[in-house]
């Protein structure tokens, strides 16, 4: 419970996504006063829900792993852990114009795209990557050179390069090897913790329910939330107080705080925070972001039966096919099957200006090409979400290019997802980031 004390530090948390909520949670739990500012009318950011057809579910695809210990701890705190559903999933590959299952060792050995030696090189690369712990060294090597070295040129060109292009576009050539290492580590996390096999899960009701319970929990412990409030300026006065100016309900308002924690993307920090040093501004400006254009479909029938289908054939406008219907019980979607069709692009890509109708036509044509049994009359609803700043591009030596969490001005902290260097971007990793940094913020704020 928060400490009722007039002298307790007053914090403004910029951003009501999962990172901002988790930061507010830890500040509140140590007795600080917290106000969250969120420009949207709902909390959650990339984890927020929306309505598609007659179903309310996650705007972007998310899944919980058994090995996601930080997320599972939060769900226990919110009393949602008993409402988890766990399933085993299947993985597919679309290669050489056909769907292939790679959900077991036997299926991997039968995979026709690679010969036995290439499969050995691929398997050895993944196994070797799972044993590595020194991600700092991998940061100084390009992902292409590392994968070519361990998997060989032919395996790289048949498997790794198409997957990297789907996820990163041509930017994969500037990406460090710790990027793929982090994915391998997440794949093997369950085995390292003693589990025989990874399980995928979700909370009944999706992130709409998680966020509702999280917001209620924070409010009941004294955290204030300013939703639908666009922060326009953050300044520090001579008395070292921080002043947050924001627009809400058509009016300009200001609140004052002892400290500010910015959990928003780097371009947004640059836009609204005054007084950043030249070094801080340069580092924030050099952060490149990947965004996503993600089309959701509610179908009357399932597609291929794989949770994720990776695409290695050229010329497909998708990063992959995510069939949430393979995980969710039918009653969660009113008997429908939810499919996500994401496409990751750089934040300045023209895809963000493309009309939704054009995107939908391309997605439907792609499904017709991949799944001969698919018919357009099976689509109950279709709509597209776009986010320009999803993941910072992990370039060579990326960890040394970031801003420190503690800014040069006392009381200002820069804690956004661009700080993640040794993990993939997911909710559990965001929570882990907060756990690793919150103590330093506390010490710095009381220095």
Model-derived segments and spans:
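Conserved Rossmann-like nucleotide-cofactor binding loop
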Residues: 19, 42, 267
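Short FAD-binding loop at a beta-strand-to-alpha-helix junction that anchors the flavin cofactor
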Residues: 339-340, 404-423, 429-433
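Internal hydrophobic alpha-helix adjacent to the cofactor/substrate pocket in enzyme cavities
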Residues: 430-447
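Active-site/ligand-binding neighborhood in enzyme catalytic cores
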Residues: 6, 114, 124-234, 242, ...
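Glycine-rich FAD pyrophosphate-binding loop
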Residues: 28-52
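Dinucleotide-binding Rossmann-like beta1-alpha1 core, especially the glycine-rich loop
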Residues: 53-135, 162
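Mid-domain catalytic core of redox enzymes
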Residues: 30, 230-339, 343-353, 357, ...
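N-terminal Rossmann-like FAD-binding beta1-loop-alpha1 element of flavoenzymes
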Residues: 9-36
């Amino acid at each position: 419970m928060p400490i009722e004390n007039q002298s307790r530090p007053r914090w403004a948390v910029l951003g009501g996504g999962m990172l901002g909520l988790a930061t507010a949670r830890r500040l509140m739990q140590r007795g600080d006063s917290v106000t969250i500012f969120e420009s949207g009318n709902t909390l959650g950011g990339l984890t927020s829900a929306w309505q598609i057809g007659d179903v309310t579910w996650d705007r972007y695809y998310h899944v919980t792993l058994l090995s996601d210990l930080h997320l599972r701890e939060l769900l226990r705190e919110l009393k949602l852990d008993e409402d988890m559903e766990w399933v085993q999933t299947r993985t597919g590959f679309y290669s050489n114009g056909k769907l292939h299952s790679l959900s077991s060792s036997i299926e991997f050995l039968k995979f026709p795209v690679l010969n036995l030696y290439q499969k050995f090189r691929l398997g050895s690369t993944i196994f070797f990557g799972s044993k590595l712990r020194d991600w700092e060294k991998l940061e100084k090597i390009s992902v292409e050179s590392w994968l070519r070295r361990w998997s060989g040129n032919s395996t790289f060109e048949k498997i790794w390069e198409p997957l990297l292009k789907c996820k990163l576009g041509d930017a994969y050539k500037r990406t460090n090897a710790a990027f793929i290492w982090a994915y391998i580590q997440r794949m093997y996390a369950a085995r390292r913790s003693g589990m025989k096999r990874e399980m995928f899960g979700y909370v009944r009701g999706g992130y709409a329910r998680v966020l509702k319970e999280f917001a209620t929990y924070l409010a009941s412990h004294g955290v204030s939330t300013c939703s639908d409030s666009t922060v326009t300026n953050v300044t520090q006065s001579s008395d070292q107080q921080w002043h947050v100016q924001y627009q809400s309900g058509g009016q300009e308002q200001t609140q004052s705080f002892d400290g500010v924690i910015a959990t928003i993307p780097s371009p947004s920090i640059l836009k609204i925070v005054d007084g950043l040093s030249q070094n801080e501004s340069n580092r924030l400006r050099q952060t490149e972001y990947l965004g996503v254009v993600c089309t959701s479909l509610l179908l009357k029938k399932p597609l291929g039966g794989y949770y994720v289908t990776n695409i290695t054939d050229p010329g497909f406008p998708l990063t992959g096919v995510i069939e949430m219907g393979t995980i969710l019980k039918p009653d969660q979607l009113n008997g429908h099957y939810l499919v996500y069709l994401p496409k990751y692009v750089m934040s300045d890509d023209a895809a963000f200006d493309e009309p939704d109708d054009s995107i939908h036509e391309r997605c439907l044509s792609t499904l017709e090409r991949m799944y001969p049994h698919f018919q357009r009359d099976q689509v109950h609803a279709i709509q597209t979400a776009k986010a320009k700043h999803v993941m910072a591009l992990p370039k060579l030596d990326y960890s040394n290019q970031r801003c420190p969490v503690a800014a040069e001005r006392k009381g200002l902290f820069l804690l956004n997802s661009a700080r993640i260097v040794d993990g993939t971007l997911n909710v559990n990793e965001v929570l882990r980031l907060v756990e690793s940094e919150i103590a330093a913020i506390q010490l710095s704020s009381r220095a």
